[in-house]
Amino acid sequence: MEDVPLFVLGLIASSIVAAAIGVLYSLVLPGIERKVQARIQQRIGPPILTPGFWSVLKFGYKKRVDPNAQMPRLYRSLVYFGIGIVVLLFLFTTPYWWAVLGWGSILGIAGLLKLEEVLYVLMGSQSQSFLSTGMPVPDIAKGSKHIGIKREFVEQHSGERALKMMAIGSLPLYLALLVPFAMAKSTMIRSVVAMQNPGYIMSSNWLSAPLPSSPVLFTLPGILAAIVYFVGYVMLLNEKPFSILKAKIDLIEGGVLEYASKLRAYYYIMRNVLMFALSSIFVTLFIGIPFDPFMPVMMVLNLALSLLLPIMLAALVAFSPILTFRQIYPAAIGLSAIGVLALIISLGV
C-alpha cells in the first residue's frame, strides 16, 4: 500500500510530461509531411512549423466565431472530446498506464479509436454551414429538387460517409493491431513489448537504451500486418486516397467545415495528435520501443521512429487521387483478408 501514492505520483508526472511532449511534437509532423510531399512533387513546400505549430497559433488568436449547427454546444464540444480521446489514446501506450485497470491493452486502444471515428459521424450530422443552407427563393433549375422537399446539407453526406468508413474502412487497422497481441498471446501492451524487448522490461537504469531483440516487424505476419496498419493509418487520418469524408469537389471540408478560429485550432491539435499517437503505437507494438518519459533515450528513439509513417504518408499522398466507395470497399476487403492471413500466421508462430 505504501507504493500506491508513489505510483500515482509517477502516473501523473509521466502523463503530464508525455502529453506535453506528444502535443508539441505532433505540431511538427504535418510540416515534415508537407515538406516531403512538396519535394516529391518538385516544389519547395511550406516551412516545417507552418502547417502545424503556426497554424494552431494563428487560429488560436482569431476572434471567436459561433458555428452554424443544429446543436451548437454539442458541435463545439465534439472537438474537445476529440482532443481528450486522442491524448488518452497516446497515454494508454506509455508504460505507467500499462498497469491501470487494463487500459494499456488492445481493448483500450481499439475502444478509443472507435470513439474518435464516431466523432466524425456526429460532426457531419450537426454542422450546417452557410455554403449548403437552403436558398431564399425556390430553386427551379433543371435537376433540382421540387418545391417543398427538404434540402439536405452537404455535411450530412460527410456524416454518412464517415459511418461507412467506420463500418468497413477502418477494419484493416483493427485486424493489424491484433497481430502483435496474438504473437504475444496476451491482450496487454506490456506483454507485447516484453516479447520483443525483454531488456527494457528488466532494465531499471533511466539512461539505458535496451534495443529489441525480436521485433514483430521483422517477421512475416508482422510485415503483412504493418502494410495493413499503414493503409488503415491513412484511412483514419482521412488522407488521400481515402479522404472522401472531406473531398473538396463535393463536400468542401465535410463535418469540420464550421470549425473556425479557436475551434479550428483545436481541430488541428486533435488531428495532429492522432497522427502522432498512431505512429507511436506502431513503434511500440511492431518494433518494441515504447514512449517512456522517464527513459530519455527510449523516448527519443520512439519519437524518431514515429517519423516513418508520416513520411510514407507524404509519399502516398503526393501521387494519390481520391477514391470513391466503389474502390474503397474492395480495397478494405482485400486488406482485411491480408490482415486475417497475418493473424492466422501469427497464431501459429
Model-derived regions, located:
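Juxtamembrane/interfacial segments at transmembrane-helix boundaries in multi-pass membrane proteins
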Residues: 3-7, 83, 97-103, 107-108, ...
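Alpha-helical transmembrane segments
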Residues: 10-26, 101-115, 211-236, 295-298, ...
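Juxtamembrane inter-helical linkers in multi-pass membrane proteins
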Residues: 35-60, 132-158, 239-263
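Transmembrane alpha-helix boundary signature
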Residues: 87-101, 121-133
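Alpha-helical multi-pass transmembrane bundles of energy-transducing inner-membrane proteins
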Residues: 123-210
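Membrane-water interface at loop-to-transmembrane-helix junctions
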Residues: 206-224, 251-275, 282, 297
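Interfacial loop-to-transmembrane junctions
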Residues: 312-339
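Juxtamembrane boundary at the C-terminal end of a transmembrane helix
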Residues: 342-349
